[in-house]
A protein has these predicted regions:
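Short acidic, glycine-rich surface-loop motifs adjacent to enzyme active sites
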Residues: 90-97, 196-216
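Active-site neighborhood of phospho(di)ester-bond hydrolases with catalytic His/Asp-centered motifs
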Residues: 35-37, 86-92, 126-132, 175-176, ...
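Generic beta-strand structural signal
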Residues: 35, 89, 166-167, 357-359, ...
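Flexible loop/turn segments at secondary-structure boundaries
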Residues: 43, 95-97, 135-137, 181-182, ...
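N-terminal active-site segment of His-dependent metallophosphoesterases
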Residues: 3-6, 10-101
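Extracellular low-complexity, Gly/Ser/Thr-rich intrinsically disordered linkers
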Residues: 170-171, 206-210, 335-378
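Catalytic-core region of carbohydrate-active enzymes that cleave or remodel glycosidic bonds
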Residues: 110-118, 224-246, 349-350
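Extended active-site neighborhood of metal-dependent phosphoesterases/phosphodiesterases
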Residues: 6-22, 48, 55-60, 99-202, ...
C-alpha cells in the first residue's frame, strides 16, 4: 500500500459480492491512532436493569449491549477525530475465556462477532494484544492475522504469540503478557529492534498494567511482571508502554529501572508461562509479611522526570493505562495514588485516547466518549 492513498475491497459471502468498502492509508510522517481499553464484550453480564427484570443480564443480552456500546464508541471517536488511521487495543476484546469448553467457546464466538460487527472496523485497521480473557483458547488466532508473530516464544498461550509491526517511524511491539516468561518478551523486543534499527519511536503494547492505578490489579497480581519487564524496557530504550487490564485510566511520569536485583516470585509461575493467581491471591490477602515484602520488591523503578505538558528528550519510559472503551466493566482506583502516577481518572464512563506521532513528537489526549471532552491534560514527548 502507498501512503496517503485510498483503496477499495470487496468480500464474497455465500457466493455474492458484498458492497465495496473503502480503506485509506495515512501519512507516515504524521499519523494518529485510537487507543481503546478492554472492550470486553459480554462483561456486563452481572449487571441488572429493567430489561432483565432486576436479574443479571446473562451472556446474550450482555454481548448485545456491550457490542452496541462498542459501536457507539468507535463511531463517536471517528466523528470527533477523523484523522485516526488505525486502532490499538491492549487486549480483552471478549469476556468469556473459552477454556476449550464447547459452551464457553460458543459464547466467546458470539462476543467476537459482536466486537467485529462495529461498522467502523470495515474501514479501520486494528492491532490488538492478547488479554487474560483472550488467552485461554485459539479463538483469538481465528480472528486476527498478526504480522511478524514471535514463533520462537517458549511458553505461548493457546491464543498465540507476541508480534511486531512498524508504521511510519514507529515500531510497535505487542507482547502477550499472559506468558509470564520475561525471557520470551526480551527476545521479541530485541528481534523487533534488530529488524527495525532506524525506528525513532519504540512502543510496547501489552495487557497487564505494570504501572497502573486500579484497585483490582495495580497493587497485586498486575505488577508481578514489573520487576522483570522494567529493566528490559529500560535497556532497550522503549519510549512508551500502552497497557490495559485495570479498567481505569492512569498516566505515569517518565520511569527508569533502579538497576537493582529484585525477586521474580518464580514460585507463582506455571509451567506453561502462566501465573497461579489463586495461590498468590490467597497468600497476598492473608500473609501481611509477604504482602509487605512483595510491595517492597516492586519498588524497582526511579522517577526520572516529573515534567508535564511537553517534555524534551526525557529519560525513561512513559506508561499509559486505558479505561474501558465500552463501559462493560469498571474498577475503582486504588485509594492511595502511587508516586509514579502523574494523573489518573475513574468517571465510570467509556473513554478513548488519540495518539499522534510525527517525526519528532508523540502526543496523547484522552476523551470522554459521550461528550468528547478531554479527560486529562495533553502530554507530549519531543525527541530531537
Amino acid at each position: 500500500f502507498k501512503p496517503n492513498s485510498t483503496y477499495y475491497y470487496q468480500v464474497k459471502l455465500n457466493g455474492e459480492w458484498q458492497q465495496a468498502q473503502e480503506y485509506k492509508t495515512g501519512d507516515p510522517d504524521n499519523f494518529s491512532f485510537m487507543f481503546v481499553g478492554d472492550p470486553q464484550i459480554g462483561s456486563s453480564y452481572k449487571q441488572k436493569n429493567a430489561e432483565s427484570n432486576g436479574k443479571k443480564l446473562g451472556n446474550d443480552l450482555a454481548a448485545r449491549n456491550d457490542s452496541y456500546n462498542w459501536n457507539v464508541t468507535l463511531n463517536k471517536a471517528m466523528e470527533q477525530h477523523p484523522e485516526i488511521d488505525f486502532l490499538v487495543s491492549p487486549g480483552d476484546q471478549v469476556s468469556v475465556k473459552g477454556n476449550e469448553d464447547a459452551k464457553d467457546l460458543k459464547e466467546q464466538e458470539d462476543q467476537y462477532s459482536g466486537y467485529l460487527s462495529a461498522s467502523v472496523l470495515r474501514n479501520l485497521p486494528q492491532a490488538v494484544a492478547i488479554g487474560n480473557h483472550d488467552c485461554s483458547s485459539a479463538s483469538y488466532q481465528n480472528h486476527f492475522n498478526n504480522p511478524n508473530p514471535f514463533l520462537e516464544e517458549s511458553t505461548p498461550t493457546p491464543a498465540g504469540n507476541g508480534y511486531f509491526y512498524s508504521y511510519g517511524n514507529a515500531l510497535f511491539i505487542v507482547i502477550n503478557a499472559n506468558n509470564y516468561n520475561a525471557a520470551d518478551h526480551k527476545a521479541l523486543i530485541e528481534k523487533a529492534i534488530k529488524e527495525n534499527p532506524n525506528a525513532k519511536w519504540r512502543i510496547v503494547v501489552m495487557h497487564q498494567d505494570i504501572y497502573g492505578s486500579g484497585l483490582d490489579h495495580s497493587d497485586s497480581d498486575g505488577i508481578i511482571l514489573r520487576t522483570q519487564l522494567t529493566p528490559i524496557f529500560d535497556a532497550n530504550d522503549i519510549d512508551v508502554v500502552l497497557q490495559g487490564h485495570d479498567h481505569s485510566y492512569a498516566r505515569t511520569y517518565q520511569l527508569t529501572s533502579d538497576g537493582q536485583a529484585h525477586d521474580e516470585f518464580l514460585e507463582y509461575k506455571q509451567d506453561q508461562g502462566g501465573f497461579n493467581h489463586d495461590n498468590f491471591d490467597e497468600r497476598f490477602e492473608k500473609d501481611g509479611v509477604f504482602r509487605a515484602y512483595y510491595k517492597s520488591q516492586n519498588l524497582c523503578y526511579n522517577i526520572a522526570d516529573k515534567s508535564q505538558g511537553t517534555v524534551v528528550n526525557p529519560e525513561g519510559v512513559f506508561y499509559l493505562t486505558s479505561n474501558s472503551a465500552t463501559g462493560s466493566k469498571f474498577y475503582n482506583l486504588i485509594p492511595e495514588q502511587q508516586d509514579y502516577v502523574a494523573a489518573r481518572s475513574q468517571n465510570w464512563r467509556p473513554s478513548y485516547s488519540v495518539i499522534n506521532i510525527t517525526k519528532d513528537s508523540f502526543t496523547v489526549n484522552t476523551y470522554d466518549v459521550e461528550t468528547g471532552e478531554v479527560i486529562d491534560s495533553s502530554y507530549t514527548i519531543v525527541k530531537k
